[in-house]
Amino acid sequence: MASSQTSQTVAAHVPFADLCSTLERIQKGKDRAEKIRHFKEFLDSWRKFHDALHKNRKDVTDSFYPAMRLILPQLERERMAYGIKETMLAKLYIELLNLPREGKDAQKLLNYRTPSGARTDAGDFAMIAYFVLKPRCLQKGSLTIQQVNELLDLVASNNSGKKKDLVKKSLLQLITQSSALEQKWLIRMIIKDLKLGISQQTIFSIFHNDAVELHNVTTDLEKVCRQLHDPSVGLSDISITLFSAFKPMLAAVADVERVEKDMKQQSFYIETKLDGERMQMHKDGALYRYFSRNGYNYTDQFGESPQEGSLTPFIHNAFGTDVQACILDGEMMAYNPTTQTFMQKGVKFDIKRMVEDSGLQTCYSVFDVLMVNKKKLGRETLRKRYEILSSTFTPIQGRIEIVQKTQAHTKKEVVDALNDAIDKREEGIMVKHPLSIYKPDKRGEGWLKIKPEYVSGLMDELDVLIVGGYWGKGSRGGMMSHFLCAVAETPPPGDRPSVFHTLCRVGSGYTMKELYDLGLKLAKYWKPFHKKSPPSSILCGTEKPEVYIEPQNSVIVQIKAAEIVPSDMYKTGSTLRFPRIEKIRDDKEWHECMTLGDLEQLRGKASGKLATKHLHVGDDDEPREKRRKPISKTKKAIRIIEHLKAPNLSNVNKVSNVFEDVEFCVMSGLDGYPKADLENRIAEFGGYIVQNPGPDTYCVIAGSENVRVKNIISSDKNDVVKPEWLLECFKTKTCVPWQPRFMIHMCPSTKQHFAREYDCYGDSYFVDTDLDQLKEVFLGIKPSEQQTPEEMAPVIADLECRYSWDHSPLSMFRHYTIYLDLYAVINDLSSRIEATRLGITALELRFHGAKVVSCLSEGVSHVIIGEDQRRVTDFKIFRRMLKKKFKILQESWVSDSVDKGELQEENQYLL
């Protein structure tokens, strides 16, 4: 029956190849008119076929939606995320086509952003894949639009269920049944960027005159296609409706000088600009829905009913009995009940996943109301909506609040409010006209926003050094579109910095011309960044660049940002929020960038906020504290730092050939054997000295582990040896073989050699050990303490991870602490329920690595429920008292995971 219904759709008859050839013609169209003509021809033929297929039938639900969701994939809301990026597709193609990993075509796919010089497709993965696939694929595919959508549905659902093998299987079906041209467009649909050269508004306007407006108030592509299938029939009422996500009204950036004029010389409202997640709430009785500004549904997180979620249970009783239904617009905030303050988004938390965060709670800050009961309020004035909002619910501190507003008349009041927001470390202020009506997806229209970074001179700016780059995509293909920036480790007085810590990635603030000019300036200095052998002068966090540049060849850029926030992606342990390049500091040399000390001082100055100055009326937007003048560049005599000077070996007499032509780099010596003395002795034995290790350096000698030595160790390119080894060589006048006791650090090849010669404690497999050496070996063996099972759990987990046993089914629950619903009364051990399947489940959990507890308290990660689900509500109430929230799952999650040998997606078993 289902297949019969499917065959009665236009999408089941239209080949995917026809859609792709249409998209190809649209993209290649010379002008807008030609592009529109090609799309209209395809749309008209679809509608004609639809009329022929469904003639004389009423209530037909078939529409243009199957094609529209592929043409405008960025507006897709029904399908979940694919979880696929260009790199994954590249690896899949390499595997499917059996391409040599180091071959030309495989490297093209893997390094698609790197310009090749031959073509202008750098950064366009779909085009590069097309040319690789063209000689290897079918001339024409066999899939229909319906089949493509069904396979993409499978990709999305299996990605959500973390079933990677099934994701791969569906992708293979798509790939093996498509031509190279079809795969080019398929890739763009998956990546959600078609590059057609016409906007979604143009597509909508061709489809139907009311399409843009209907999509703004519903964000539902399928509803637009169904309700507006007939271009000759319009909608009489297009307005915000209950449980349909709408695109919210937005604020325009304001010029402080023009505020009074923009408000038409009338009074206006000033509100705090909140730093949370824009969210709309739809309520009908005890049924709730929550939607983000882009129309994504977050009801599962915040709660569909008063019995579930991180918000709904706490606000349901705030609504009066006379309020059956309503639609609210506001900001979802993270509230700290201890300090009674809102958290800023820059701090590490996700408001949409607050159940996992301890010490914080979800708070809905409401600033507008669009419907109460059956009365729609979008066309009412803001003043009227505010009056209605105040009687819609009773605010509950830290759970649901009304954003406070003040009435103002002058520019001075706006300036005072902005300065007050700066003092309170807030994001900024909103200015709203009392007579404005609510216009979905419109920016401005009576709403303005003012943030400190919009006002010249209010922000502290940072002078940072470019140390890495990322190849661009699309219009920026073939050039660096983003840069990795760093600050310097504070050098000793009189020295230049030699080590730089990454701080942020920046990709905005400059025009294409400025980007091109900067690219030309740095082009010849870029080097590929290898994660296994990073440059010792650039220390990265988890964020690594695609290419890097030696600091002395780079330039300083001046960056403006909103604030400094914590981040483990960068070596500094922090990064910049909303960074953008203000200008290139041609007046500064590379070593004059800010240091870690400067960064720390800025971070402590205003809790990380970079807006610390006040604006004053009549100052022409200049702050009281004047801008720093650029530091003028003074001519300095060229000199070499003392510790990098080559030693004076003119008076050295050669006494041995033990180190003939062997290169050493001495970083430091020992008490009684300073660096210069060791260098002289090496020269006497025929060796020669360098001040920076290179590929020909035999080893680095270090008496202490300073910053330079640590950087050399982190690069993993050179062996680092104690000076004691040199002293042994000088004493015996031979090149003494290395032993573990001499080594500070070993590069990979040396480690392999030592692994064949010595055990993990440094005891040789082949050479007899004397008493002193044996004592050293014993000192390196630490006695193991008696540990409880609880203490052993992380040790076992570490061993499993070290030896790659952590993927074994026997350890699948290793990191979980689990409470089972075995007691009629929570935490009353005397109320144990006998003869229940959960007793066996507890044994299965222990056998597969879980820690099973009989007391429900902080630290429990999961609660498992059997067939008797009467206590689920009790567990949810108990959970609200805990800082770290546990998940409540059906027992079948355990049994299914054990049966299938891997953890199953938890969301399918949630109660």
Curated annotation (Swiss-Prot):
Residues 654-743, 808-911 form the BRCT domain. Its main location: nucleus. The active site is at K273. GO terms for cellular component: condensed chromosome; DNA ligase IV complex; DNA-dependent protein kinase-DNA ligase 4 complex; nonhomologous end joining complex; nucleoplasm. ATP binds at E271, T272, K273, L274, R278, E331, K345, F367, E427, K432, K449, K451. It is found in: Nucleus. This is DNA ligase 4. One of its GO terms (biological process) is cellular response to lithium ion.
